[in-house]
From Swiss-Prot:
Keywords: Disulfide bond, Extracellular matrix, Glycoprotein, Leucine-rich repeat, Proteoglycan, Repeat, Secreted, Signal. Residues 1-19 form the signal peptide. The O-linked polysaccharide on Ser-96 is probably the mucin type linked to GalNAc. There is one glycosaminoglycan chain, known to be dermatan sulfate, and it is probably the O-glycosylation at Ser-64. Residues 58-108 are annotated as: Disordered. It comes from Mus musculus. It is found in: Secreted, Extracellular space, Extracellular matrix. GO terms for biological process: articular cartilage development; bone development; sensory perception of sound. Disulfide bonds join 118-130, 279-312. Residues 106-143 form the LRRNT domain. This is Epiphycan. Belongs to the small leucine-rich proteoglycan (SLRP) family. SLRP class III subfamily. It holds the Pfam family LRR_8. LRR repeats lie at residues 144-165, 168-189, 192-213, 238-258, 259-280, 290-310.
């Protein structure tokens, strides 16, 4: 009987494990990045955060069991004025508890409404999440901020001082705002910025960017014919992924760094490609090994007219050959 009981218990445990939902983190570097964006209804999965921070967040979610985390109530008494003040305090829209951030000041700098940024948003170590908070401007960020997410807000402009002196910033994600204007020095002086995501906005002119970038997504904006400066990406020697889909571009922004692995330009107005766009016409043995993912589908270009333009590539571009 004891053996049967242990077998039954083992089967119950295995069944519970198999029934548990899996968690997939959003991967910026995926080869099917665009497909993931189409299939993903929310952007609340984060990556490149130290494992212990992610684990802390998951633990606090299990403990809270509630998406809305209210600020602590008054310690003594039940004075009505104190209750009213408590009700007027913004809620943290996140499942994680606000741990003590690694910044000067417990809750970081204050916004224009005199709320601490880490109370209005959610700070986990050096990562700041301000997603879906109806913000109309970049909040003042703690000086040690490394990753900043402010997606699905109403931000219209990025000022040159919004990220000033934030020398540790590695990622900025401002997906799905109303951004139409960016000051020229908004990003250029950030010494360690690696990933910049500005997709789904109204940007008409891309400012000068730091050469440290490895990942750029400016898809679904309004860059048009003149929105990208000449040789904008030339000196980005570590740039791996460049996404400029749905922008009414009529040309491929050249030159592109040798480090580039993925170039997505679908759904633009590109009409032609030159033989030296990707290859070296003076060196017929040249092979561009890194660039394996080129998307030109949704453009009026006929790729069959310039076969020499991609003879050096490991894979044919995706697009029309008719």
């Amino acid at each position: 009987m004891g053996m049967l009981a242990r077998v039954a218990l083992g089967l119950i445990i295995i069944d519970a494990v198999l029934a548990a939902p899996t968690t997939e983190l959003f991967n910026y570097d995926s080869e099917v990045y665009d497909a993931i964006l189409e299939d993903t209804g929310t952007f609340y999965n984060y990556e490149h955060i130290p494992d212990n921070h992610v684990e802390n967040e998951k633990v606090s979610e299990r403990l809270s069991g509630n998406r809305e985390l209210l600020t602590p109530g008054p310690q003594l008494g039940d004075n009505q004025d104190e209750d009213k003040d408590e009700e007027s305090t913004p809620r943290l829209i996140d499942g994680s508890s606000p741990q003590e951030p690694e910044f000067p000041g417990l809750l970081g700098p204050h916004t224009n409404e005199d709320f601490p940024t880490c109370l209005l948003c959610t700070c986990i170590s050096t990562t700041v999440y301000c997603d879906d908070h109806e913000l109309d401007a970049i909040p003042p960020l703690p000086k040690k901020t490394t990753y900043f997410y402010s997606r699905f807000n109403r931000i219209k402009k990025i000022n040159k001082n919004d990220f000033a002196s934030l020398n540790d910033l590695k990622r900025i994600d401002l997906t799905s705002n109303l951004i139409s204007e960016i000051d020229e020095d908004a990003f250029r002086k950030l010494p360690h910025l690696q990933e910049l995501v500005l997709r789904d906005n109204k940007i008409k002119q891309l400012p000068e960017l730091p050469n440290t970038l490895t990942f750029i997504d400016i898809s679904n904006n309004r860059l048009g014919r003149k929105g990208i400066k000449q040789e904008a990406f030339k000196d980005m020697y570590d740039l791996h992924h460049l996404y400029i889909t749905d922008n009414s571009l009529d040309h491929i922004p050249l030159p592109l760094p040798e480090s580039l692995r993925a170039l997505h330009l679908q759904n633009n107005d590109i009409l032609e490609m030159h033989e030296d766009t990707f290859c070296n016409v003076k060196n017929l043995t040249y092979v561009r090994k890194a660039l394996e993912d080129i998307r030109l589908d949704g453009n009026p270009i006929n790729l069959s007219r310039t076969p020499q333009a991609y003879m050096c590539l490991p894979r044919l571009p995706i697009g029309s050959f008719i």
